[in-house]
Regions:
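Juxtamembrane regions of bacterial inner-membrane/periplasmic proteins
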Residues: 2-295
Protein backbone atom coordinates (compact mmCIF):
# COMPACT_ATOMS: atom_id res chain seq x y z
CA UNK A 1 0.00 0.00 0.00
CA UNK A 2 2.80 2.38 0.95
CA UNK A 3 4.65 1.52 -2.25
CA UNK A 4 1.57 2.32 -4.36
CA UNK A 5 1.11 5.65 -2.57
CA UNK A 6 4.80 6.43 -3.09
CA UNK A 7 4.51 5.77 -6.84
CA UNK A 8 1.41 7.95 -7.03
CA UNK A 9 3.21 10.80 -5.29
CA UNK A 10 6.12 10.50 -7.71
CA UNK A 11 3.78 10.72 -10.71
CA UNK A 12 2.01 13.76 -9.25
CA UNK A 13 5.32 15.49 -8.58
CA UNK A 14 6.43 14.72 -12.12
CA UNK A 15 3.35 16.45 -13.56
CA UNK A 16 3.66 19.41 -11.15
CA UNK A 17 7.14 20.18 -12.44
CA UNK A 18 6.08 20.10 -16.09
CA UNK A 19 5.42 23.37 -17.87
CA UNK A 20 1.98 24.05 -19.33
CA UNK A 21 3.30 23.45 -22.85
CA UNK A 22 4.75 20.07 -21.91
CA UNK A 23 1.51 19.07 -20.18
CA UNK A 24 -0.47 19.93 -23.31
CA UNK A 25 1.96 18.00 -25.50
CA UNK A 26 1.82 15.01 -23.17
CA UNK A 27 -1.98 15.14 -23.24
CA UNK A 28 -2.03 15.26 -27.04
CA UNK A 29 0.40 12.34 -27.28
CA UNK A 30 -1.71 10.34 -24.82
CA UNK A 31 -4.86 10.99 -26.84
CA UNK A 32 -3.10 10.01 -30.07
CA UNK A 33 -1.87 6.75 -28.54
CA UNK A 34 -5.35 5.94 -27.21
CA UNK A 35 -6.86 6.83 -30.60
CA UNK A 36 -4.37 4.57 -32.37
CA UNK A 37 -5.11 1.65 -30.05
CA UNK A 38 -8.86 1.88 -30.70
CA UNK A 39 -8.80 3.10 -34.34
CA UNK A 40 -9.36 -0.33 -35.86
CA UNK A 41 -12.92 -1.74 -35.77
CA UNK A 42 -13.30 -5.05 -33.97
CA UNK A 43 -14.83 -6.52 -37.13
CA UNK A 44 -13.26 -5.30 -40.36
CA UNK A 45 -15.76 -6.56 -42.92
CA UNK A 46 -19.52 -5.99 -42.76
CA UNK A 47 -20.71 -7.73 -45.92
CA UNK A 48 -23.19 -10.55 -46.62
CA UNK A 49 -21.85 -13.95 -47.61
CA UNK A 50 -23.10 -16.76 -49.81
CA UNK A 51 -24.71 -19.81 -48.23
CA UNK A 52 -22.38 -22.73 -48.94
CA UNK A 53 -23.15 -26.42 -48.37
CA UNK A 54 -20.54 -29.19 -48.58
CA UNK A 55 -20.50 -32.95 -48.15
CA UNK A 56 -18.75 -34.74 -45.29
CA UNK A 57 -15.39 -34.40 -47.06
CA UNK A 58 -15.76 -30.68 -47.70
CA UNK A 59 -16.73 -31.11 -51.38
CA UNK A 60 -19.14 -28.46 -52.64
CA UNK A 61 -22.76 -29.60 -52.98
CA UNK A 62 -24.24 -26.21 -53.78
CA UNK A 63 -24.41 -22.54 -52.86
CA UNK A 64 -26.76 -19.54 -52.83
CA UNK A 65 -25.60 -16.09 -53.88
CA UNK A 66 -25.19 -13.45 -51.14
CA UNK A 67 -28.01 -10.98 -50.51
CA UNK A 68 -26.11 -8.20 -52.32
CA UNK A 69 -25.89 -10.26 -55.52
CA UNK A 70 -22.24 -11.24 -55.06
CA UNK A 71 -20.73 -14.71 -55.11
CA UNK A 72 -18.80 -14.19 -51.87
CA UNK A 73 -18.12 -17.37 -49.91
CA UNK A 74 -17.70 -17.10 -46.11
CA UNK A 75 -14.12 -16.15 -45.08
CA UNK A 76 -11.53 -18.89 -45.13
CA UNK A 77 -8.99 -19.39 -42.33
CA UNK A 78 -6.02 -20.52 -44.42
CA UNK A 79 -4.52 -19.74 -47.81
CA UNK A 80 -3.38 -22.52 -50.18
CA UNK A 81 0.39 -22.55 -50.65
CA UNK A 82 0.36 -21.89 -54.41
CA UNK A 83 -1.91 -18.88 -54.05
CA UNK A 84 0.18 -17.61 -51.13
CA UNK A 85 3.39 -17.80 -53.17
CA UNK A 86 1.76 -16.18 -56.21
CA UNK A 87 0.20 -13.31 -54.26
CA UNK A 88 3.32 -12.43 -52.33
CA UNK A 89 5.48 -12.56 -55.46
CA UNK A 90 3.05 -10.42 -57.45
CA UNK A 91 1.68 -8.00 -54.86
CA UNK A 92 3.97 -7.72 -51.86
CA UNK A 93 7.44 -9.28 -51.93
CA UNK A 94 8.27 -7.98 -48.45
CA UNK A 95 4.99 -9.10 -46.89
CA UNK A 96 6.65 -11.07 -44.10
CA UNK A 97 9.18 -8.33 -43.32
CA UNK A 98 7.15 -5.14 -42.91
CA UNK A 99 4.65 -3.86 -40.33
CA UNK A 100 1.83 -3.07 -42.73
CA UNK A 101 3.62 -0.35 -44.70
CA UNK A 102 6.63 -0.92 -46.95
CA UNK A 103 8.67 2.33 -47.18
CA UNK A 104 10.66 1.01 -50.15
CA UNK A 105 7.48 0.28 -52.12
CA UNK A 106 5.99 3.65 -51.22
CA UNK A 107 9.18 5.43 -52.30
CA UNK A 108 9.40 3.48 -55.55
CA UNK A 109 5.72 4.15 -56.34
CA UNK A 110 6.13 7.87 -55.61
CA UNK A 111 9.14 8.07 -57.95
CA UNK A 112 7.32 6.21 -60.74
CA UNK A 113 4.22 8.39 -60.39
CA UNK A 114 6.25 11.61 -60.50
CA UNK A 115 8.30 10.36 -63.44
CA UNK A 116 5.20 9.42 -65.46
CA UNK A 117 3.19 12.43 -64.23
CA UNK A 118 0.30 10.10 -63.42
CA UNK A 119 -0.50 7.30 -60.98
CA UNK A 120 1.06 4.12 -62.34
CA UNK A 121 1.82 2.43 -59.02
CA UNK A 122 0.22 2.57 -55.59
CA UNK A 123 2.89 0.96 -53.43
CA UNK A 124 0.22 -0.63 -51.25
CA UNK A 125 1.07 -3.71 -49.23
CA UNK A 126 -1.34 -6.63 -48.95
CA UNK A 127 -2.20 -5.35 -45.46
CA UNK A 128 -3.07 -1.91 -46.84
CA UNK A 129 -5.12 -3.51 -49.61
CA UNK A 130 -7.02 -5.52 -46.99
CA UNK A 131 -7.87 -2.28 -45.19
CA UNK A 132 -8.95 -0.71 -48.50
CA UNK A 133 -11.26 -3.64 -49.22
CA UNK A 134 -12.81 -3.31 -45.77
CA UNK A 135 -13.32 0.47 -45.96
CA UNK A 136 -14.32 0.66 -49.65
CA UNK A 137 -13.62 4.40 -49.83
CA UNK A 138 -12.51 6.61 -52.72
CA UNK A 139 -8.78 6.45 -53.45
CA UNK A 140 -7.44 9.81 -52.29
CA UNK A 141 -4.20 10.90 -50.62
CA UNK A 142 -5.99 11.31 -47.29
CA UNK A 143 -7.50 7.84 -47.56
CA UNK A 144 -4.05 6.45 -48.36
CA UNK A 145 -2.73 7.88 -45.09
CA UNK A 146 -5.64 6.35 -43.18
CA UNK A 147 -4.96 2.99 -44.84
CA UNK A 148 -1.32 3.16 -43.76
CA UNK A 149 -2.24 3.92 -40.15
CA UNK A 150 -4.88 1.19 -39.97
CA UNK A 151 -2.57 -1.29 -41.72
CA UNK A 152 0.08 -0.91 -39.02
CA UNK A 153 -2.61 -1.36 -36.38
CA UNK A 154 -3.91 -4.50 -38.09
CA UNK A 155 -0.40 -5.96 -38.03
CA UNK A 156 -0.45 -5.71 -34.22
CA UNK A 157 -3.81 -7.48 -34.00
CA UNK A 158 -3.59 -10.25 -36.59
CA UNK A 159 -0.94 -12.67 -37.79
CA UNK A 160 0.40 -12.52 -41.35
CA UNK A 161 -1.57 -15.65 -42.26
CA UNK A 162 -4.78 -14.15 -40.86
CA UNK A 163 -4.24 -10.97 -42.88
CA UNK A 164 -3.60 -12.98 -46.03
CA UNK A 165 -6.79 -14.98 -45.43
CA UNK A 166 -8.78 -11.76 -45.00
CA UNK A 167 -7.43 -10.48 -48.30
CA UNK A 168 -8.09 -13.61 -50.37
CA UNK A 169 -11.59 -13.91 -48.88
CA UNK A 170 -12.64 -10.40 -49.95
CA UNK A 171 -10.58 -9.54 -53.04
CA UNK A 172 -12.57 -8.80 -56.24
CA UNK A 173 -12.15 -11.26 -59.11
CA UNK A 174 -14.30 -9.63 -61.76
CA UNK A 175 -18.05 -9.27 -62.21
CA UNK A 176 -19.90 -10.43 -59.11
CA UNK A 177 -17.19 -12.88 -58.05
CA UNK A 178 -15.56 -11.97 -54.74
CA UNK A 179 -13.02 -14.01 -52.81
CA UNK A 180 -10.75 -16.91 -53.67
CA UNK A 181 -13.24 -19.74 -53.08
CA UNK A 182 -15.97 -18.29 -55.29
CA UNK A 183 -13.38 -17.46 -57.97
CA UNK A 184 -11.92 -20.98 -57.92
CA UNK A 185 -15.32 -22.58 -58.45
CA UNK A 186 -16.60 -20.01 -60.96
CA UNK A 187 -13.49 -19.92 -63.16
CA UNK A 188 -12.10 -23.43 -62.78
CA UNK A 189 -14.90 -25.60 -61.39
CA UNK A 190 -13.01 -26.88 -58.35
CA UNK A 191 -11.82 -25.84 -54.91
CA UNK A 192 -8.93 -23.46 -54.20
CA UNK A 193 -6.94 -26.32 -52.69
CA UNK A 194 -6.85 -28.02 -56.11
CA UNK A 195 -5.66 -25.01 -58.14
CA UNK A 196 -2.70 -25.54 -60.47
CA UNK A 197 0.19 -23.09 -60.66
CA UNK A 198 -1.27 -21.54 -63.81
CA UNK A 199 -4.70 -21.17 -62.21
CA UNK A 200 -3.19 -19.74 -59.01
CA UNK A 201 -1.15 -17.23 -60.99
CA UNK A 202 -4.20 -16.08 -62.95
CA UNK A 203 -6.21 -15.54 -59.78
CA UNK A 204 -3.28 -13.72 -58.14
CA UNK A 205 -3.10 -11.08 -60.89
CA UNK A 206 -6.86 -10.70 -61.40
CA UNK A 207 -7.68 -8.46 -58.37
CA UNK A 208 -5.04 -5.98 -59.62
CA UNK A 209 -7.52 -4.71 -62.25
CA UNK A 210 -10.63 -6.93 -62.31
CA UNK A 211 -12.67 -4.41 -64.32
CA UNK A 212 -10.08 -4.27 -67.12
CA UNK A 213 -8.63 -7.76 -67.37
CA UNK A 214 -11.03 -10.68 -67.28
CA UNK A 215 -12.22 -13.58 -69.38
CA UNK A 216 -14.57 -11.68 -71.69
CA UNK A 217 -12.17 -8.84 -72.53
CA UNK A 218 -8.51 -8.17 -71.98
CA UNK A 219 -7.64 -11.86 -72.29
CA UNK A 220 -4.27 -11.11 -73.89
CA UNK A 221 -3.36 -8.77 -71.05
CA UNK A 222 -4.52 -11.28 -68.47
CA UNK A 223 -2.50 -14.07 -70.12
CA UNK A 224 0.60 -11.87 -70.32
CA UNK A 225 0.32 -10.92 -66.65
CA UNK A 226 -0.18 -14.54 -65.64
CA UNK A 227 2.83 -15.74 -67.62
CA UNK A 228 4.99 -12.89 -66.35
CA UNK A 229 4.19 -13.95 -62.80
CA UNK A 230 4.98 -17.57 -63.62
CA UNK A 231 8.37 -16.42 -64.95
CA UNK A 232 9.02 -14.60 -61.68
CA UNK A 233 8.19 -17.78 -59.78
CA UNK A 234 10.68 -19.64 -61.98
CA UNK A 235 13.38 -17.00 -61.45
CA UNK A 236 12.88 -17.20 -57.68
CA UNK A 237 13.12 -21.01 -57.92
CA UNK A 238 9.66 -21.44 -56.41
CA UNK A 239 8.80 -23.63 -59.40
CA UNK A 240 11.12 -25.60 -61.67
CA UNK A 241 11.45 -25.33 -65.45
CA UNK A 242 9.18 -28.28 -66.26
CA UNK A 243 6.44 -26.91 -63.99
CA UNK A 244 6.85 -23.52 -65.65
CA UNK A 245 6.56 -24.94 -69.17
CA UNK A 246 3.43 -26.88 -68.25
CA UNK A 247 1.90 -23.83 -66.54
CA UNK A 248 2.42 -21.36 -69.41
CA UNK A 249 0.93 -23.90 -71.83
CA UNK A 250 -2.34 -24.02 -69.87
CA UNK A 251 -5.08 -22.00 -71.60
CA UNK A 252 -7.22 -19.47 -69.79
CA UNK A 253 -10.77 -20.65 -69.00
CA UNK A 254 -13.27 -19.74 -71.70
CA UNK A 255 -16.20 -18.77 -69.48
CA UNK A 256 -17.33 -19.04 -65.85
CA UNK A 257 -18.50 -22.44 -64.64
CA UNK A 258 -21.91 -22.90 -63.01
CA UNK A 259 -21.60 -23.87 -59.37
CA UNK A 260 -22.54 -27.45 -58.46
CA UNK A 261 -26.20 -27.90 -57.50
CA UNK A 262 -26.17 -31.52 -56.40
CA UNK A 263 -28.57 -31.12 -53.47
CA UNK A 264 -30.70 -28.04 -54.25
CA UNK A 265 -33.40 -28.81 -51.68
CA UNK A 266 -30.78 -29.17 -48.96
CA UNK A 267 -29.13 -25.91 -50.01
CA UNK A 268 -32.52 -24.17 -49.84
CA UNK A 269 -33.04 -25.51 -46.33
CA UNK A 270 -29.66 -24.26 -45.12
CA UNK A 271 -30.33 -20.94 -46.84
CA UNK A 272 -33.38 -20.55 -44.61
CA UNK A 273 -31.71 -21.81 -41.43
CA UNK A 274 -28.04 -20.87 -41.78
CA UNK A 275 -27.87 -18.12 -44.39
CA UNK A 276 -24.42 -16.76 -45.16
CA UNK A 277 -22.49 -19.66 -43.60
CA UNK A 278 -20.60 -22.80 -44.47
CA UNK A 279 -22.54 -25.95 -43.61
CA UNK A 280 -20.92 -29.39 -43.73
CA UNK A 281 -23.33 -32.32 -44.09
CA UNK A 282 -22.93 -36.08 -43.66
CA UNK A 283 -23.71 -36.63 -47.35
CA UNK A 284 -21.19 -38.31 -49.65
CA UNK A 285 -20.97 -36.19 -52.81
CA UNK A 286 -20.08 -39.12 -55.07
CA UNK A 287 -23.02 -41.18 -53.85
CA UNK A 288 -25.38 -38.21 -54.08
CA UNK A 289 -24.31 -37.57 -57.70
CA UNK A 290 -24.82 -41.25 -58.58
CA UNK A 291 -28.31 -41.22 -57.09
CA UNK A 292 -29.21 -37.99 -58.90
CA UNK A 293 -28.00 -39.34 -62.25
CA UNK A 294 -29.86 -42.62 -61.76
CA UNK A 295 -33.02 -40.75 -60.81
CA UNK A 296 -32.96 -38.35 -63.77
CA UNK A 297 -32.43 -41.21 -66.21
Amino acid sequence: MEQTRFMGDKILNFFKHLSVTKRVLLGIITLLVIGYIFCLPRQLFHVPYSTVVTDRNGELLGARIASDGQWRFPPRKTTPEKIRQCLITFEDKNFYYHWGVDPLSIGRATYQNLKNKRIVSGGSTLTMQTIRLARNESRTFGEKVIEMILATRLEFRASKEEILSMYVSHAPFGGNVVGLDAASWRYFGHSAEDLSWAESAMLAVLPNAPAIIHLSKGRKTLLAKRNRLLKQLLDKEIIDSSTYELAVSEPLPDEPHPLPQIAPHLVSRFYQERSGRYSRTTINKGMQTHIAVSYTH
